[in-house]
Design a protein with these regions (language model features):
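Sec-dependent N-terminal signal peptides
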Residues: 4-13
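N-terminal signal peptide c-region/cleavage motif recognized by signal peptidases
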Residues: 14-18
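Extracellular beta-rich repeat passengers
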Residues: 20-75, 80-87, 91-93, 105-115, ...
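Residue-level detector of conserved, well-ordered beta-strand and adjacent loop positions
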Residues: 75, 131, 267, 466, ...
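Primarily the HKD phosphodiesterase
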Residues: 99-101
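C-terminal outer-membrane/trafficking sorting elements
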Residues: 471-479, 483-558
């Protein structure tokens, strides 16, 4: 039994090391370091565009208006017409410097279907640009065309009611007026690659396809996209809905920019469990969603807020978020619909660390009892830590009682006392938003130190092994954890067979056997772990098949 216990400890340590490899440790909070007065430390330099409304792009020379069923390479200036899907496990390669202009009349969009790939590798000096086909003279605006949709076979927690019954969950991506096979996403392969999306700008997308709520597309929509996909250096500007939205899967990303978009900047749903580091949000006081609730972060597990697994449990770090009030000096128009810097609801469990939020109406809202339990009672499940919410935000905390949130904030180094002047960006609030900003920190900035990467959520929170490679399993979730009497073990399996589940105490003794040779099917499986007979403390749950053994940490706290 001692050997099993030591193996459990070794597995947890290995998981931590694997997860840490993604993160770039910083001393500073926010997306940018202290300036060295050279472009080298400003990762938005060269490839971002702060004035796309007035950028004259060349006229299109070729047109794509039908699905792409064979591997294809694009270059030059392309007119994108209709919904164009890359199908049949094909690869769409887009060369650096290519400009693809979306058609307004047909509400065009580009869809990368499950099994297909996009290889869009731009460079800092030759980014790939997706933009509106409208001219500067005619005027461009949010929602001129559809956007980019990447779909994969990663695990999601929500299946559509009209889908064919599968041994896994799949769904149609939201936004389209009718469902068709090319917009299905979800499966069992969280390590899948949908290609590369690097040094890319997306401008003026997010069209509403109908008058029905949630019928808008986004800048970059990711449905069930796996961690083998490379996404970095992506700017979404003037998007008519969300800049970036993740529906399940576990794709990672670095260096994301949301600039003057309409609805939410980073929206996570349906069990997404990836990681994002280095992100910039810049809002415009005159651009918000008329339907209400324009937020920086908006995160759901599932509506209503019930315990569907896997949980939405992604981790963000090093985000700089500039709200519509900027340094607090900007008066918002009476028709504005801005809300929160962070809106966590419907049983979500995302974590945000080492980040700065300035100029919002509200700061952090933890909404609903199940969501609150994830943060206030289960720090290994979800956490907000080492944040600065500037003192110009009138309501730093909403959703729970202020005293509860103050206690939470104090324990997790969430600072609500710093002014924008103390945060001290190099040029964070230019008079005109079209002016190139500089969100690096001056040497005297209070955000120049204090970041930390020791929180357990950086290693997957121990309770989530979705980011490790396993022979039998794609995803393992144990929820709730800590357990107050009963928890559910969610297992997304790669194999058919049998599974045994044991609970082991810290001495190595088996104290509970929730499953003995239980049938295991490819896809979603559930095991109830009844902890009522266990004393408060730390345990290890082992999952054993004919191919492998995995271990998850369990905390019991009645």
């Amino acid at each position: 039994m001692k050997k099993i216990y030591l193996s459990a400890i070794a597995l947890v340590a290995s998981s931590m090391l694997s997860a840490q490899a993604f993160w770039t440790a910083t001393s500073y909070k926010g997306a940018f370091p202290v300036t060295d007065n050279t472009p080298a430390t400003n990762w938005t330099d060269s490839w971002c565009n702060w004035d796309p409304e007035n950028t004259n792009y060349p006229a299109t020379t070729t047109t794509i208006s039908a699905n792409i069923a064979t591997s294809t390479t694009l270059s030059g200036v392309v007119h994108l017409v209709n919904n164009v899907a890359v199908t049949n496990n094909s690869t769409l390669t887009i060369l650096p410097g290519t400009i693809i202009r979306g058609d307004k009349a047909t509400k065009s969009c580009l869809i990368i279907t499950r099994g297909s790939k996009i290889m869009a590798q731009g460079t800092a000096t030759a980014p790939i640009i997706f933009t509106s086909n409208e001219t500067v003279a005619n005027g461009r605006g949010p929602g001129d065309w559809g956007g980019i949709v990447i779909l994969g076979n990663g695990v999601i927690n929500t299946a559509c009611t009209s889908c064919t019954v599968q041994p896994f969950k799949e769904n149609y991506v939201e936004g389209f007026t009718t469902n068709f096979p090319e917009i299905l996403y979800g499966g069992t392969t969280n390590n899948e690659s949908s290609g590369v999306f690097s040094y890319v700008r997306i401008e003026f997308s997010g069209v509403a396809l109908s008058a029905t709520p949630n019928s808008e597309l986004n800048g970059l929509t990711m449905g069930g996209v796996g961690q083998g996909t490379k996404i970095d250096h992506v700017q979404c500007s003037f998007i008519g809905d969300d800049a970036f939205e993740w529906f399940g899967g576990n794709v990672d990303a670095k260096y994301l920019v949301s600039f003057r978009c309409l609805d939410d900047d980073f929206d996570t749903d349906f069990g997404w469990q990836g990681r994002v580091q280095f992100g910039l949000i810049v809002r415009d006081k005159d651009i918000s969603d008329a339907a209400g609730d324009s937020n920086g972060f908006e995160s759901d597990n599932f509506n209503p807020g019930i315990g569907r697994l896997p949980l939405t449990q992604g981790v963000f770090s090093n985000i700089t978020s500039i709200g519509p009030k900027r340094d607090g000096s900007v008066a918002l128009p009476p028709t504005e619909k801005f809300e929160r810097a962070i809106f966590a609801r419907r049983n979500t469990a995302i974590s945000i660390h080492n980040s700065i939020f300035v100029g919002w109406e509200k700061g952090l809202e933890i909404n609903g009892a199940t969501t609150a339990d994830n943060y206030l009672n289960s720090p290994d499940t979800a956490d907000m830590e080492n944040l600065i919410i500037s003192d110009d935000v009138p309501r730093s905390f909403t959703g729970q009682t202020y005293s509860v949130m103050q206690t939470y904030a104090s324990a997790r180094n969430i600072d609500t006392t710093k002014t924008a002047a103390q945060i001290n960006f190099v040029n964070g609030f230019p008079t005109a938003l079209e002016t190139t900003p500089d969100y690096r920190l001056n040497a005297a900035s209070t955000a120049s130190a204090g970041a930390s990467f020791t929180n357990t959520t950086f290693s997957g929170g121990f309770t989530n092994l979705a980011n490790t490679t396993k022979e039998s399993f794609t995803t393992i979730n144990l929820y709730p954890n800590p357990s107050k009497g009963s928890s559910t073990l969610y297992i997304n399996s790669k194999i058919n067979g049998a599974i045994s589940v044991n609970v082991i105490d810290i001495s190595g003794k088996v104290v509970l056997i929730p499953a003995m040779d239980q049938e295991l099917n490819i896809g979603s499986n559930y095991v109830t772990v009844d902890t009522q007979s266990l004393s408060n403390g730390i345990y290890f749950v082992t999952l054993t098949t004919g191919l492998s053994k995995e271990t998850v940490k369990l905390i019991v706290n009645h």
